[in-house]
Amino acid sequence: MDAFNYRGGELFAEGVALSAIAERFGTPTYVYSRAHIEAQYRTFADALEGMPHLVCFAVKANSNLGVLNVLARLGAGFDIVSGGELERVLAAGGSADKIVFSGVGKTREDMRRALEVGVHCFNIESTDELGSRLQIVAAELGVRAPISLRVNPDVDAGTHPYISTGLKENKFGIAIADAEDVYVRAAQLPNLEVLGVDCHIGSQLTTLEPFIDALDRLLALVDRLGDCGIYLRHIDLGGGVGVRYRDEEPPLVADYIKAVRERLDGRDLALMFEPGRYIVANAGVLLTQVEYLKHTEHKDFAIVDAAMNDLIRPALYQAWMDVTAVRPRDTAARSYDIVGPICETGDFLAKGRELALEEGDLLAVHSAGAYGFVMSSNYNTRGRCAEVLVDGDQAFEVRRRETVAELFAGESLLPE
């Protein structure tokens, strides 16, 4: 579904005009659609109906409590990578026993807290996490820690190198060539309980082949482990299903799940997925206002009140984000670079966009629901945006805008 549509010459989020949101909450503001989030989650859940499964939303994509609560109400699980994300999920009403704890840098304190609340399992990223960390922490608490090994299948996801995570040179996971030995070691540790196998080969994948290649390699490993007397209960295929930003043609989730289920036919394995971008990317826009237009001999600039500190994907990944006027004009369009107030040449949201603009116009940067606010910063001492969640014809502020005073409230001067 597309939650952002024009009505009477104006862009709406579900049943709320974006201009009304700007008037009420100001700009820049992230705007999310509850209906879109729910529809995307159900695409996964419905395709898995009839078999044991858990769809764990990747909290790193969008960690707003309002967004997490929408998913918790649907019965979603959650994929986390820090103690902070654990506390967010719990505060949002998520069930601890539906949380998988991933990440290469889990601290002992993180592990202890996760064991105390009873997470579903830890996705182990290295051998050092086993004996020298998790085994010791679990023994101190007198419990068995449920684990899954994150196996690196050495599959090229064919995506941006910063978000490709399944190659042998990446920092993530345990090399598939070493995995069997690590499983044998884990099975011998008294305070660990081996549950499954996990992999995540990258983000924003637009073909099925890398997923299926990785799955086939994991299933071969599952068979070898069975020969050793180690029987796994689940297989976690991570996230990575791409979305449409411009002209991509990502695979349908139904086709992906169908191919996976065919390969698992006859196997007693539950299926787990960790989608993030797929669920929230196109559920959100960044709403921004044109401060003024700057025309030079070589370029035309639309200087807006949002900047790279609010949305860093274009600067960091050279990501293409669609930009449209909230109230399109009938006048002649010009090619504009959409730039912010940050003191960096790399501070841009889009380049070379054909738009008819005037000072004060509102723009919507689309597909901003994933890796938007969560990657924002206070660079140039700029307060972070407000976040608004739209539910039908109502808009709710689920995060208020930061004030300048809050930015240095935790700082202090040296004594005289």
Curated annotation (Swiss-Prot):
It comes from the Bacteria. Keywords: Amino-acid biosynthesis, Decarboxylase, Lyase, Lysine biosynthesis, Pyridoxal phosphate. It is an enzyme of class 4 (lyase). Its EC number is 4.1.1.20. Transmembrane segments: none annotated. Specifically catalyzes the decarboxylation of meso-diaminopimelate (meso-DAP) to L-lysine. This is Diaminopimelate decarboxylase. It comes from Pseudomonas fluorescens. The gene is lysA.
